[in-house]
Amino acid sequence: LLRRQRQMCIRDSIKGIDAAEKISILSSICFGCKILNKGFIVEGITNITIDDINFAKELGLKIKLLAISEKIGNYIKQRVHPCLIPSSLDIANINGVINAIVVDGTPIGRTIYEGEGAGKGPTTSAIISDISSIMVGNDDFSFGHSPKTKKHFKRYNFNKHECKYYI
């Protein structure tokens, strides 16, 4: 049973499902909105080949699965897909079970947070934190916001989405 669960977790990571769930929760925390768990692009790394990796390396780039969320006016634009990023960036060197969060905002500028995103320790820590909050009566403020104060944003229309693509 544990082996099957581990295989499912790996599959979810490769397909981008795990990253999509994490960015949905982070968007809710950052923007004070309901969790957006559908209506956005989710593309994993299953179609990345060794040739893609080698070509990126020749260009001084790395391929990373990124989960991106941004607020544009009254819209939340959320997506998960492989990206080519310069090898010199800090997040290009995040590997294994380590996850990184890059926050770019005013007035703080760009900050990076990193830590384990999988395994017994991080999962246990998150569960204990949630249980502690509920035990002290703080169950109305999941993700730092009361359900009564959650903002309603529209989902971004990806038919309007423009970006560079590697073919």
What would you call each of these model-derived segments?
Residues G109-T111, G115-G121:
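Glycine-rich phosphate/pyrophosphate-binding beta-alpha loops
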Residues A126, I131-I167:
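A conserved regulatory-domain signal marking ACT and ACT-like small-molecule sensing domains
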Residues L1-I10:
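Single conserved hydrophobic/aromatic residue that forms the stacking wall/gate
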Residues M8-C9, I45-I63:
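Active-site loops and adjacent core secondary-structure elements that bind or stabilize anionic groups
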Residues S27, A67-I68, P82-L84, A92-I94, ...:
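Short beta-strand elements
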Residues I14-K22, E43, N47-D51, I98, ...:
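Conserved active-site and cofactor/substrate-binding residues in soluble primary-metabolism enzymes
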Residues E21-I35, D130:
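Oxidoreductase and adenylate-handling cofactor-binding alpha/beta cores
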